[in-house]
């Protein structure tokens, strides 16, 4: 019987009623491979890509798109194959029949696995071969494509088997369809929901919570379910560094295969019909579900009210969630509503664990917010200041040995990538600046802008934190960073691009105008870029104490690139004629070489050079501030307030007023991001001989320094409530 069960005749006979699975796989892989390939090729042709771009896109298709689409089809097919092959375990009559056959369960298990592999492999190989042939007909055939196709075959088979064995494990451990469906959903989504709950808890209870995913949280999310193991592998595969994820995928597959085989072979037939065939699993599942559910439902109630009753609602939600979820599980286990309150001792234990977890978060018993490493135990820090210094648009450039450049735009978001791709630094000034920021956050500082730090200790472990930073703290931090040579070299690495690729330089000056510089003088443009590079590297942190006096934008073209990831995280293919890169850099008064060249243009590099006729400041009143508000009732304006539709306007035209305002205003592009005033006010600067257009003259400026007292008084009289620097 053992040899007969693997015969082709028996395989054909036992596949009756399951032939729809390979038919489904054939159609699904037809859509995922050949049809998708033809659609994408049509779109590429519409966009008139060059041949080198098309080759890059076709190679990426096999490295990325086919991997994702094939994985989705493989997962769905694996689910259908597992359910179709082991569905009989939910029927006592069929269980008695199959398990009474003179065949070992292990042999029966392997027989069904072999059928499932055949259901998958035959359609897959046919459709993948068709996709290769389509590419070859379009001129894309190469040994590298064949290699990628073979690799995809192996990878998709691993993913297929992982989902297959995971589904079989669920079916083998459960005795009813309801419990099987719930357990399958839990196995594949539990870690995702748990990670979201942990992330939300950290955001609500910890002031220095880091929004990215790393360490234990990343492990829970990425390794806690078969689905996320596959997704994590796909995310890393296109980058080329997927060895670790591949080992995790294979290890998880072996674990699921072994567990499903053991669960099937040791399953007691008489337990069919029970919620869980292995009753020892009931308290384990109850703990894994009840405790997080109690905490999660408590968080929902915690977020509903806006007043001081949040804590009371939070406690109520945790109690309700713990009792409700535990009772529902007991009803499912026993299939009897009267068993809702079964296991009262267990419920009390779970409730105690929920209370301990909640108390730990609320009182920060683990010291999350107070964490700060000792200087001697610190290997270095990585800082993401994209939220503080957003005026400059920069990119990281790395020159390869063959003259090809690798381009990566500087992280503009506050995710983990902004802490992984930047240099590691260590200095006393930087350490003291971060220490001051941490102390202010410990005191409950809630206003300012958020920045992210990764501390790396000497043992190689990383700890990430997010801090709220005031304008003064940001100033100290940026000064410390500009003293770090490695940080500046990385931040302004685009200067490594060969001078021949610099095609245009544009400047923004103190009058707000945008001017093209040295349009017909390539040597002058190159000299300006070199002067700015030297000024940045040779000047330290004292440089950024002053406000910028200009911004220079460098446009490069014809760069030989291996393809790059843009600021939106999209892969951009390399092109034969080269890539384009645009950057913008602030120019400070300390940059003497750069200013010497810019003075030749005659454009204003100081507000003192502007002949201002008058300045109209528009104050936008708070809707909550009425005319009888006590805060404003005794405030008298220094100037005449002219009422507008949404506030007041004041025109300042006296010499002393204009001179005072010149010291604290700049075009919005020429302001350090960390010193912009968040005020409900805007201004229009009208130069001599220029007519006002009612706030739309194009010469918009913003506050960027010490605000004169007469402006503060008028703002208060105009009911301006938002009147702080970054705070």
Language model regions located:
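Terminal transmembrane helical anchor/hairpin motif
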Residues: 39-62, 193-280, 295-315, 368-395
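Function-determining sites in protein domains
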Residues: 343-350, 360-727
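Hydrophobic alpha-helical transmembrane segments
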Residues: 1-90, 260-268, 299-309, 330-345, ...
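Transmembrane helix boundary and interhelical loop/hinge segments in multi-pass membrane proteins
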Residues: 82-101, 113
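Secretory targeting signals
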Residues: 59-60, 67-70, 115-175, 179, ...
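Central hydrophobic cores of alpha-helical transmembrane segments
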Residues: 180-191, 319, 342-354
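Internal/C-terminal transmembrane anchor helices
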Residues: 286-293, 329-369
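Membrane-interface alpha-helices at helix entry/exit sites of multi-pass transporters
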Residues: 104-116
């Amino acid at each position: 019987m053992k040899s007969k069960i693997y015969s082709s005749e028996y395989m054909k006979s036992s596949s009756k009623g399951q032939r729809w699975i390979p038919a489904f796989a054939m159609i699904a892989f037809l859509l995922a491979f050949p049809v998708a390939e033809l659609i994408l090729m049509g779109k590429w042709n519409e966009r008139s890509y060059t041949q080198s771009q098309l080759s890059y896109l076709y190679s990426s298709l096999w490295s990325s798109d086919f991997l994702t689409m094939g994985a989705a089809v493989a997962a769905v097919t694996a689910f259908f194959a597992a359910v179709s092959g082991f569905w009989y375990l939910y029927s006592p009559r069929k269980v008695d029949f199959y398990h009474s056959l003179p065949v070992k369960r292990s042999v029966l298990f392997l027989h069904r696995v072999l059928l499932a592999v055949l259901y998958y492999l035959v359609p897959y190989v046919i459709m993948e071969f068709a996709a290769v042939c389509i590419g070859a007909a379009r001129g894309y055939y190469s040994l590298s494509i064949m290699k990628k196709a073979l690799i995809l075959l192996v990878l998709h088979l691993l993913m297929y088997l992982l989902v297959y064995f995971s589904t079989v494990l669920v079916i083998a451990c459960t005795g009813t369809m309801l419990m099987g469906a719930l357990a399958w959903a839990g196995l594949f989504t539990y870690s995702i929901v748990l990670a979201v709950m942990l992330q939300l808890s950290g955001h609500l209870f910890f002031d220095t919570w880091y929004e990215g995913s790393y360490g234990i949280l990343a492990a829970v999310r990425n390794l806690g379910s078969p689905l996320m193991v596959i997704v994590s592998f796909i995310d890393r595969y296109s980058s080329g560094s997927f060895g670790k994820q591949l080992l995790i995928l294979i290890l998880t597959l072996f674990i699921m295969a072994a567990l499903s085989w053991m669960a099937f072979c040791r399953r007691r037939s008489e337990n069919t019909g029970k919620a869980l065939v292995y009753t020892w699993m009931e308290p384990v599942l109850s703990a894994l579900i009840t405790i997080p559910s109690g905490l999660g439902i408590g968080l929902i109630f915690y977020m509903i009210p806006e007043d001081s009753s949040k804590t009371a609602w939070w406690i109520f939600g945790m109690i309700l969630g713990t009792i409700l979820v535990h009772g529902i599980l007991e009803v499912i286990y026993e299939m009897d509503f009267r068993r809702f309150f079964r296991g009262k001792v267990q419920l009390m234990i779970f409730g105690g664990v929920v209370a301990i977890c909640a108390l730990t978060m609320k009182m920060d018993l683990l010291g999350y917010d107070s964490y700060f490493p000792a200087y001697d135990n610190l290997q270095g820090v990585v800082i993401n200041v994209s939220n503080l210094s957003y005026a400059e648009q920069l990119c990281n450039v790395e020159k390869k040995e063959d003259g090809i450049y690798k381009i990566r735009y500087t992280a503009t978001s506050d995710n983990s990538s902004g802490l992984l791709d930047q240099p590691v630094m260590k200095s006393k000034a930087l350490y003291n600046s971060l220490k001051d920021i941490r102390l202010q956050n410990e005191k409950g500082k809630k206003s300012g802008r958020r920045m992210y730090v990764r501390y790396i200790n000497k043992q190689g472990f990383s700890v990430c934190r997010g801090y709220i930073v005031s304008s003064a703290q940001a100033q100290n931090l940026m000064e410390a960073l500009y003293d770090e040579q490695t940080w500046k070299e990385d931040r302004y690495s685009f200067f490594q691009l060969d001078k021949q690729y610099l095609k245009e330089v544009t400047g923004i000056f103190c009058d707000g105008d945008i001017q093209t510089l040295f349009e017909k003088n390539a040597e002058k443009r190159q000299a300006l870029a070199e002067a700015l590079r030297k000024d940045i590297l040779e000047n330290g942190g004292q440089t950024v104490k002053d406000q910028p006096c200009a911004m220079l934008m460098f446009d490069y073209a014809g760069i030989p690139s291996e393809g790059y990831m843009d600021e939106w995280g999209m892969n951009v293919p390399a092109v034969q004629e080269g890539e384009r890169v645009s950057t913008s850099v602030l120019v400070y008064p300390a940059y003497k070489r750069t200013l010497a060249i810019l003075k030749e243009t005659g454009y204003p590099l100081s507000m003192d050079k502007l002949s201002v006729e008058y300045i109209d400041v528009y104050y936008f009143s708070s809707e909550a501030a009425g005319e009888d508000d006590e805060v404003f009732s005794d405030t008298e304006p220094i100037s005449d307030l002219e009422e507008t539709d949404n506030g007041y306007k004041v025109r300042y035209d006296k010499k002393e007023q204009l001179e005072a305002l010149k010291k604290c205003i700049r075009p919005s592009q020429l302001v350090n991001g960390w010193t912009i005033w968040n005020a409900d006010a805007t201004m229009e600067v009208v130069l001599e001989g220029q007519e006002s257009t009612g706030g739309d003259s194009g010469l918009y400026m913003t506050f960027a320094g010490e605000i004169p007292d007469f402006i503060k008084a008028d703002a208060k009289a105009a009911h301006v409530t938002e009147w702080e620097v970054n705070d």
